[in-house]
Amino acid sequence: MISPVVLWPALAWLTIIPLAVANGALRQFVLAPRFGIRTAQPISGGLLMVAIAAVAWLLVGRLGSRHMQVWIAIGAAWFVATVAFEFGMGATSGKSWAEMLAPYRFTDNNIWPLVLVWVACAPAVLALVRRPTIP
């Protein structure tokens, strides 16, 4: 049987994928045509960070009070999974290294690197917000 400390964070991360895809579609088809890419990028990044916070909030409620090391490990796992997913999808779709690395630069107001920092920090931050007595 899979431990809840492994299962629930993995399922939570998997729910972030469709949220991120929907966010990308919103940016490409609604925000960018209306506001331009330089405005759409930070709006989209902020919306994705809010969605990730909501998922982390629900995860903290599901797993309850755990040691801070658990929340830090969950954030690290989410970070590694996200970067691996991004590069895996890029490689399978035939993108070059330059194309895959482009989102990791702050160009056209892109805040993807900040989103990745938030992916890593969100479980611990939301654990502290939701359960301030975590050891």
Feature names for model-found ranges:
Residues L114-P135:
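Membrane-water interface at the C-terminal end of transmembrane alpha helices
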Residues I37-P42, G64-V80:
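Internal alpha-helical transmembrane segments of multi-pass membrane proteins
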Residues A102-V119:
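Individual transmembrane alpha-helices with interfacial aromatic-anchor signatures
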Residues M1-A32:
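N-terminal signal-anchor transmembrane alpha-helix
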Residues L26-F35, G94-Y104:
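Membrane-interface helix termini and inter-helical loops of multi-pass transporters
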Residues V55-W57, F85-M100:
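Transmembrane alpha-helical segments of integral membrane proteins
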Residues V6-A10, L14, P42-G46, W71-A76, ...:
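Hydrophobic alpha-helical transmembrane segments
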Residues L19-A20, T39-G61, W78, L114:
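Core segments of alpha-helical transmembrane spans in multipass integral membrane proteins
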